[in-house]
Amino acid sequence: MAKVTMKLPDDFLKDLSRLGDKFDSVAPKVLEAGGKVILSQMRTNLASVVGKDTKYESRSTGDLENSLGMTPALQDRNGEWNIRVGVGDDKDSKGVPNALKAQLLEYGKSGQPAKPWMKSARSKGRKKAIASMKQVLEGELLP
């Protein structure tokens, strides 16, 4: 799965530190809220580039779009919470890995120009994702 790393603003990190013992129960909710925003932006960007500006008619089956997903928020051995948003490890009906299709669209190949959709999803969705995460966090801090 593709890896996206975002640095969080200092005021957001201060709010997180106020949670104390509740942090481990709130962190997955906060990460999933931000992940949903990025996933939505990825779907939008992917739909806008698949089959556009090609020499031949598109033969898209929708397998790549269907493989987009989000892992549950999990804590690693260092105690850090992570969530992954992107293309899964599955293959289409012909055995072609969807990650390969995503890479070819993102970076292009000989005779096929790049159509970046993943990187732009991260940059376009970043502010919305952080706002969504803040909203969930504030909802958890108030009660």
Sequence positions of predicted segments:
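Short, Lys/Arg-rich flexible segments
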Residues: M1-R84, D90-K94, N98-P143
